[in-house]
A protein has these predicted regions:
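Active-site helix-to-loop segments that bind/position phosphate- or nucleotide-bearing substrates
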Residues: 1-25, 64, 88-342
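Active-site-flanking structural segment that lines cofactor/substrate pockets
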Residues: 21-40
Length: 342
């Protein structure tokens, strides 16, 4: 998977034949560096700064080649997306998704999201524990017990049912929060001394691991957003996450089972290898750290994983789950969350 990330103020993205040409300021005297990116080899264009321009010809090329263009803020959070109209699917799926809010299918989906996220959090802890069984039995036992506790939370979620999501959103969110508390507490105990990761922080964090997690979640949000559009789903009509103006509620629903699988795995694997996360004064990741993280996320998304009897790249698993959600709302199949192997 190939990301092209453009952040430097004053940069420009233009088209030349079947290539994107990225021109960036380089030092004094008005000098610029240029690099050419074949559209054939590009999966996603990320623009991460104010002061970056892109030509209409470049946008047209991206549309023709199915390359989403996502504008992200300095934390990696998507603030806008440019895609071709042809990828947005049919209105039939969107209508079914809206009806699912009050016909029980929305409850089934939201419950599956909570179960899937908890299962993958537990699997992550088992994954991190397996290499510690001999060299650190205390850590191994702590992680094993935490994973079992999260699995118990997932089993409790299976018992929740109703016809309208409004009736069960709060109980589901409470269980999701309980599983996450166990998960992050365990990871803090595991990595806190080496990375300063004490607890999960979102906005305004100065902690390097949290800053990396936030950025990774932002990139993953862009991937899931695109998958939702391709499946004909409405990104703003969520179930577990309540509607709010401008909030990608359904994208936030679907992303939950993939946070541990993609973002957490990558960030903590890098931390375990001694990655020195560079930050700017405001806590944002440096450009070098963003590029390192993007490369690792792309590698993870391209890794083949077992899924329903075959091996698929993780980014294809995400797309498969978006299609499965669409079929669920249409009444053709029951949504089953993706659970990673360890």
């Amino acid at each position: 998977m190939k990301y092209e990330y453009v952040e430097t103020f004053g940069s420009a993205v233009q088209k030349h034949s079947e290539r994107l040409v990225v021109s960036e300021p380089s030092g004094e005297g008005g000098q610029r560096t240029k690099r050419q990116v074949p559209a054939l080899h590009l999966d996603h264009l990320l623009i991460g700064s104010r002061g970056v321009s892109i030509s209409s010809d470049a946008l047209e090329l991206c549309c023709e080649r199915g390359i989403p263009v996502t504008i992200v803020d300095r934390r990696g959070k998507p603030v806008g997306k440019f895609t071709a109209p042809a990828i947005h699917g049919t209105s039939r799926t969107r209508r079914a998704q809206i009806r699912a809010y009050e016909n029980g299918l929305g409850v089934t989906f939201a419950r599956s999201v909570v179960i899937g996220k908890a299962a993958n959090q537990a699997i992550n802890l088992k994954y991190f524990a397996k290499n510690r069984r001999e060299r650190s039995p205390d850590q191994y036992e702590t992680l094993r017990k935490s994973a079992e506790a999260i699995d118990r939370v997932a089993r409790r979620a299976k018992k929740i049912s109703a016809n309208c999501i409004d009736e069960v959103r709060q109980p589901l969110m409470v269980l999701e929060a309980e599983a996450s508390r166990i998960y992050w507490s365990s990871l803090s105990a595991l990595y806190g001394s080496s990375s300063g990761f004490v607890h999960r922080e979102q906005r305004g964090t100065k902690n390097p691991v949290n800053a990396a997690l936030n950025y990774a979640y932002g990139v993953l949000t862009g991937e899931v957003w695109t998958a939702c559009l391709l499946a004909g789903l409405e990104p703003y009509a969520g179930f577990l996450h309540a509607d709010r103006p401008g909030r990608l509620s359904f994208v936030l629903d679907l992303i939950e089972e993939f946070r541990p699988v993609v973002a957490d795995r990558v960030v903590f694997a890098l931390a375990a290898k001694g990655w020195r996360i560079e930050q700017e004064e405001n806590g944002w990741l440096s450009l070098a750290s963003k590029n390192k993280l993007l490369a690792s996320l792309a590698e993870r998304l391209d890794s083949p994983e077992p899924d329903r009897g075959r091996r698929r790249k993780l980014r294809n698993v995400i797309q498969r789950q978006a299609y499965a959600a669409a079929q669920h709302f249409l009444g053709n199949e029951t949504y089953v969350p993706y659970k990673q192997r360890w």
